[in-house]
């Protein structure tokens, strides 16, 4: 018997919009909203996890700070404080009675005027939250996923502002993801404009060779991921070295292991790139150690990082 998944708009629950809780089905904007036409908006992806102490949001303050930084880069003045947005995210998780789930804050430009310039328009903010499991599949978390290098190139750092988690930037990700999933792969890898590895369609990438972990530096156009930063802390705790450098595709082909990271992807092993098996073709030992340490942290089992968890 197939399970019917409700559409994103037709659900019970509450969404926080511009300071008010509204019924899920009533959370609407006008079709002439500026962001809908020109793509200038910013968002975050945040996760809440079930812990022994209760439901907690992982690295809430850092996600909210990045949202505000993205808005600043896009010259959007969010009409709320970071503390108010933090409170809104906690409230949405409570209102929707989530033990764990995904949280989506989004800021957009309103419908006061239309035209390329948004000057004088209104800025809005919403926060939604819902239950969401493993982004790239539960099996992929253990076995690893199949990845293909996309024919699409990641944005140059001076074409779009790559350190903004901007709505418009994800057209590039959408095209890359559709291209490779249509061919049966799980996710896309994108190169930068010089042909070096940048990141996945929605994830940062790490590569393991001879016990050393490598990841592209941010000049390759990759987003400064919060899960990426978390892995740096985990690696230090485990006595593992991380080197930020330019990485070529063929370095991944001959790597021992590779994995994606992201709020949605969490820590997902990569078993294959471009039909070439990586290492043993399964989750490697370094990846497994990092993955285990990550889930210990987000589920409240590592007291060293209790400050990263905000109870709702």
Model-flagged regions — what are they?
Residues 1-80, 87-91, 114-312:
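Helix-start/capping segments and mature chain N-termini
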Residues 85-100, 104-113, 130:
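Short, acidic/charged, Gly/Pro-enriched secondary-structure junctions
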């Amino acid at each position: 018997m197939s399970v019917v998944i409700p559409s994103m708009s037709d659900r019970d629950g509450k969404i926080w919009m511009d300071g008010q809780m509204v019924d899920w089905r009533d959370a609407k904007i006008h079709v002439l909203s500026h962001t809908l036409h020109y793509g200038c908006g910013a968002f975050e992806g945040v996760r809440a996890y079930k812990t022994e102490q209760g439901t907690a949001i992982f690295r809430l303050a850092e996600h909210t700070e990045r949202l505000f930084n993205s808005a600043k880069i896009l010259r959007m003045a969010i009409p709320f404080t970071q503390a108010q947005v933090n409170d809104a995210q906690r409230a949405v998780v409570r209102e929707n009675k989530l033990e764990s789930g995904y949280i989506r804050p989004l800021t957009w430009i309103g419908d006061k005027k239309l035209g390329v310039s948004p000057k004088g328009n209104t800025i809005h903010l919403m926060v939604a939250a819902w239950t969401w499991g493993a982004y790239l599949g539960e099996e992929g978390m253990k076995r690893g996923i199949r990845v293909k290098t996309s024919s699409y190139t990641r944005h140059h750092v001076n074409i779009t502002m790559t350190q903004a988690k901007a709505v418009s930037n994800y057209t590039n990700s959408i095209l890359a993801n559709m291209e490779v999933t249509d061919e049966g792969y799980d996710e896309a890898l994108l190169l930068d404009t010089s042909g070096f590895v940048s990141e996945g369609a929605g994830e940062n990438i790490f590569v393991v060779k001879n016990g050393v972990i490598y990841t592209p530096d941010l000049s390759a156009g990759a987003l400064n991921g919060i899960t990426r930063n978390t892995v740096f802390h985990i690696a230090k705790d485990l006595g593992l070295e991380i080197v930020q450098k330019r990485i070529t595709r063929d370095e991944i082909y001959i790597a021992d292991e590779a994995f994606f990271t992201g709020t949605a992807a969490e820590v997902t092993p990569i078993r294959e790139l471009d039909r070439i098996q990586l290492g043993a073709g399964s989750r490697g030992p370094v990846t497994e150690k990092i993955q285990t340490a990550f889930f210990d942290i987000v589920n409240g089992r590592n007291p060293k990082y209790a400050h990263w968890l905000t109870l709702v």
